[in-house]
Amino acid sequence: MSTQYETQGYTINNAGRRLVVDPITRIEGHMRCEVNINDQNVITNAVSCGTMFRGLEIILQGRDPRDAWAFVERICGVCTGVHALASVYAIEDAIGIKVPDNANIIRNIMLATLWCHDHLVHFYQLAGMDWIDVLDALKADPRKTSELAQSLSSWPKSSPGYFFDVQNRLKKFVEGGQLGIFRNGYWGHPQYKLPPEANLMGFAHYLEALDFQREIVKIHAVFGGKNPHPNWIVGGMPCAINIDESGAVGAVNMERLNLVQSIITRTADFINNVMIPDALAIGQFNKPWSEIGTGLSDKCVLSYGAFPDIANDFGEKSLLMPGGAVINGDFNNVLPVDLVDPQQVQEFVDHAWYRYPNDQVGRHPFDGITDPWYNPGDVKGSDTNIQQLNEQERYSWIKAPRWRGNAMEVGPLARTLIAYHKGDAATVESVDRMMSALNLPLSGIQSTLGRILCRAHEAQWAAGKLQYFFDKLMTNLKNGNLATASTEKWEPATWPTECRGVGFTEAPRGALGHWAAIRDGKIDLYQCVVPTTWNASPRDPKGQIGAYEAALMNTKMAIPEQPLEILRTLHSFDPCLACSTHVLGDDGSELISVQVR
């Protein structure tokens, strides 16, 4: 049935041709997107569907809270460790555990490492090919590519011979007739605007980033034992420090600390001289995308804040990445966020495949219920082979979180906007410099292109914080402060009979919160509200659409059968790239299939 209504400044109209892109994600989770387009190929309705049930909240009930981090860490292998961090924060908050300064520092090093790694992988491996036309790189002149690269930075891998070798590798790859992971790209699509030389440079850096990302995560291996899924502990960090090598075998020693320093230096070098120039190059040739994909970013954004500089202090003055919320586009009034307040964060399920006693009322995570109820309602196809969702009913395995009743965007763009408008000096300088270099107004950052630029900015910011926290750690060690964990309240006998806590941080993709309740030494309730829950949110009882859905509205598609515009905007949020993408007509007939191998 055709419907039309107004919400959040958009006119939702599900008449017209229906396209289905399914799935959109790679690695963690699965996502489906459906849009309606009018006769001018403009998106008039967008529907975001999470197609996988997680259920870890149910698995955790009755378990030892000290083990929760090891379970929830498996929510995601890409932003590895961040769920464990939120979990230990929550359990420590519940029990009243204070961690040593070194533990806080190392946790921040782990998080900053993740930000650098995740943003690099997203920029090149997950979203890069939405902007870089791989096959067009074959037309490039390696000498002109070298001139371009050397004009942008002092990165040593920029000689004509280097780019000739990269181009020759690509040429042999193409001539072999098996493009592998590049086989099903929309190469030649009219939205690809980079010249051949910039495409060759971008492709070369894609390969370099693929290799270098393996180096960054060695920091996790030093302090957490491995990557992905490094080790953590309630009360601190599990890594002993043995500077003079007189203590525990396998503890962190000077050799490993020197390795960490060398990786930090090389990470900052790569981000400053490769990623930042590449992001600006993409921006320079794609300025119209500074007006596409705005979505909720000019209305409602949210950040919890992260990187406490003072151990056990999560107040505004301690958090190096500021937190706050903006609603109704009032960026002059950044509101404080209280994750314990039952009126602030609430989750709704009236359009999700869950049920509450009253589906029209949202529930705070401390009162959360995870009761799966797969009931797709009146859909085209069948319950097990849905050809077209019915967004007027239930249509996603993702709940709809709201902050004071508002759908919110979270992630690098939201964080950058909040930090900028709270006057964070480093953010203001970085953003102004990038937008000035592109000759774009500040409002241009509230866009699909802006999300790409904000990730580059954050990677650079995080690299600086890596060095900052490592220097703090080394100062402590030189002063004889080696403690990395507190075991004072390790035993359940020291805990209250009943207690509850909240742990929050900022994952690369956005605001992350874990809420835990403990009774008689066991987990009685556990709820996670993750970044993708916010951004991929379905509708709520008011009909408000989520961040993904809003960002797609009013986007004009050049070739609907090649939905590059949809992928660019969705990938700008970093929901992970598609393993396979199918575009379907409104009768379920397949128009085009893209399989990324």
Swiss-Prot record:
This is one of three E.coli hydrogenases synthesized in response to different physiological conditions. HYD1 is believed to have a role in hydrogen cycling during fermentative growth. InterPro entries: Ni-dep_hyd_lsu, Ni-dep_hyd_lsu_Ni_BS, NiFe-Hase_large, NiFe/NiFeSe_hydrgnase_LSU. It is a peripheral membrane protein. The keyword Amino-acid biosynthesis does not apply. Ni(2+) binds at residues 76, 79, 576, 579. GO terms for biological process: anaerobic electron transport chain; anaerobic respiration; cellular response to starvation; fermentation; hydrogen metabolic process. PANTHER family: HYDROGENASE-1 LARGE CHAIN (PTHR42958:SF3), HYDROGENASE-2 LARGE CHAIN (PTHR42958). Pfam families: NiFeSe_Hases. Its cofactor is Ni(2+). This is Hydrogenase-1 large chain. One of its GO terms (molecular function) is nickel cation binding. Heterodimer of a large and a small subunit. Its main location: membrane. It is found in: Cell membrane. Belongs to the [NiFe]/[NiFeSe] hydrogenase large subunit family. Keywords: Cell membrane, Membrane, Metal-binding, Nickel, Oxidoreductase. One of its GO terms (cellular component) is outer membrane-bounded periplasmic space. It catalyses: H2 + A = AH2.
